Amino acid sequence: MARKNQKAPWEEEEEIIWVSKTEMKNDMEDLQKLGEELVGLKPSVLAKFPLSDDLREAINDAQRFKNEAKRRQLQFIGKLMRNEDPEPIQLALDKIRNKHSQATAALHKLETLRDRMIEEGDAVIEEVMVKYPDADRQRFRQLARQAKKEKASNKPPKAFREIFQILKDLYLNEDL
């Protein structure tokens, strides 16, 4: 006779997580969209991603296909993605996106620095000299004066552009 408070070993309670069919479909669509993003990447960038050989081959095929064949191949890529762990792939994709936004932000900072250099003059040039000791102080002063004159006389902003190019070169060489 079984006791009331005890359960049989085969009746152990497990936490069962039920996933609705709609939620499963949405997950599959997300994987397919991730696959579409991978198809849009250049082969040199794609080589850096942690992908299985089958998935890499399917992505290369999809890059060659057109229209309906490409649509079917994208669905196949979505199916292959179900067997992959999407997190490392998503992280690598986010890193690429973030790199572009960081570069854009850096260029915006350089533009602001250039504008301040033209408006405020020597004080900002000194800031630049501290940050980039290899910079030519005299050249910056000369270009800042020239940019002010060009702006006042409504001439093309040649010095304005040249200051930005010098700052950009200094910024890019700083990373090396």
Swiss-Prot record:
Organism superkingdom: Bacteria
GO biological process: assembly of large subunit precursor of preribosome
One cellular component term from this protein's GO annotations in UniProt: cytosol
Molecular function terms from GO: ribosome binding; rRNA binding
Keywords, sorted A to Z: Cytoplasm, Ribosome biogenesis, RNA-binding, rRNA-binding
CDD domains: YjgA-like (cd16331)
Localization (cell): Cytoplasm
Listed Pfam families: DarP
Record flagged with keyword DNA-binding: no
Signal peptide: none
Database matches in HAMAP family: DarP
Family the entry assigns: Belongs to the DarP family.
Main function: Member of a network of 50S ribosomal subunit biogenesis factors which assembles along the 30S-50S interface, preventing incorrect 23S rRNA structures from forming. Promotes peptidyl transferase center (PTC) maturation.
Record protein name field: Dual-action ribosomal maturation protein DarP
Organism: Aliivibrio fischeri (strain MJ11) (Vibrio fischeri)
